[in-house]
């Protein structure tokens, strides 16, 4: 099992798709990392040699990408800053509402939580 940046990569996936399990690496950046590290894109995680894993580690360390904990901390601090300056986006984050202008009269259930049932009036 290959472990990079504190993440266990899945064993039987191709290395480009396995790298996407690291927070902050998408498929495009994974392919660039593999190209820089001179690894065959068809290689599965199980078949990586120790030299290839070392090359991957060095490539990730030398890249200017924010990964895993650093990226999560960076995003958390940005949201915290928005809350502190009391801007519209900060208020939306604080109230667990959609931030980017989506409608909330209907839909937005994934952001607002499960449906709240309202009982009708009894006569």
From Swiss-Prot:
<keyword id="KW-0694">RNA-binding</keyword>
<dbReference type="InterPro" id="IPR027437">
    <property type="entry name" value="Rbsml_uS13_C"/>
</dbReference>
<feature type="compositionally biased region" description="Basic residues">
    <location>
        <begin position="102"/>
        <end position="123"/>
    </location>
</feature>
<keyword id="KW-0150">Chloroplast</keyword>
<dbReference type="InterPro" id="IPR010979">
    <property type="entry name" value="Ribosomal_uS13-like_H2TH"/>
</dbReference>
<keyword id="KW-0689">Ribosomal protein</keyword>
<keyword id="KW-0699">rRNA-binding</keyword>
<dbReference type="Pfam" id="PF00416">
    <property type="entry name" value="Ribosomal_S13"/>
</dbReference>
<protein>
    <recommendedName>
        <fullName>Small ribosomal subunit protein uS13c</fullName>
    </recommendedName>
</protein>
<dbReference type="GO" id="GO:0006412">
    <property type="term" value="P:translation"/>
</dbReference>
<dbReference type="GO" id="GO:0009507">
    <property type="term" value="C:chloroplast"/>
</dbReference>
<dbReference type="InterPro" id="IPR019980">
    <property type="entry name" value="Ribosomal_uS13_bac-type"/>
</dbReference>
<dbReference type="GO" id="GO:0019843">
    <property type="term" value="F:rRNA binding"/>
</dbReference>
<feature type="region of interest" description="Disordered">
    <location>
        <begin position="89"/>
        <end position="123"/>
    </location>
</feature>
<dbReference type="GO" id="GO:0005739">
    <property type="term" value="C:mitochondrion"/>
</dbReference>
<keyword id="KW-0934">Plastid</keyword>
<keyword id="KW-0687">Ribonucleoprotein</keyword>
<dbReference type="GO" id="GO:0015935">
    <property type="term" value="C:small ribosomal subunit"/>
</dbReference>
<dbReference type="GO" id="GO:0003735">
    <property type="term" value="F:structural constituent of ribosome"/>
</dbReference>
<dbReference type="InterPro" id="IPR001892">
    <property type="entry name" value="Ribosomal_uS13"/>
</dbReference>
<dbReference type="InterPro" id="IPR018269">
    <property type="entry name" value="Ribosomal_uS13_CS"/>
</dbReference>
<comment type="function">
    <text>Located at the top of the head of the 30S subunit, it contacts several helices of the 16S rRNA.</text>
</comment>
<comment type="subunit">
    <text>Part of the 30S ribosomal subunit.</text>
</comment>
<comment type="similarity">
    <text>Belongs to the universal ribosomal protein uS13 family.</text>
</comment>
């Amino acid at each position: 099992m290959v472990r990079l940046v504190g993440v266990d990569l899945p064993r039987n996936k191709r290395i480009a798709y396995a790298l996407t399990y690291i927070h902050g690496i998408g498929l495009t950046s994974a392919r660039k990392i593999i190209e820089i590290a001179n690894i065959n894109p068809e290689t599965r995680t199980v078949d990586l040699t120790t030299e290839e894993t070392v090359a991957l580690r060095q490539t990730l360390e030398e890249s200017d990408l924010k990964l895993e904990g650093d990226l999560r901390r960076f995003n958390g601090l940005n949201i915290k800053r928005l809350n502190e300056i009391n801007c519209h986006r900060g208020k939306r984050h604080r109230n667990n509402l959609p931030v980017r202008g989506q409608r909330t009269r209907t839909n937005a259930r994934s952001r607002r939580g499960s449906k709240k049932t309202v009982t009708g009036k009894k006569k």
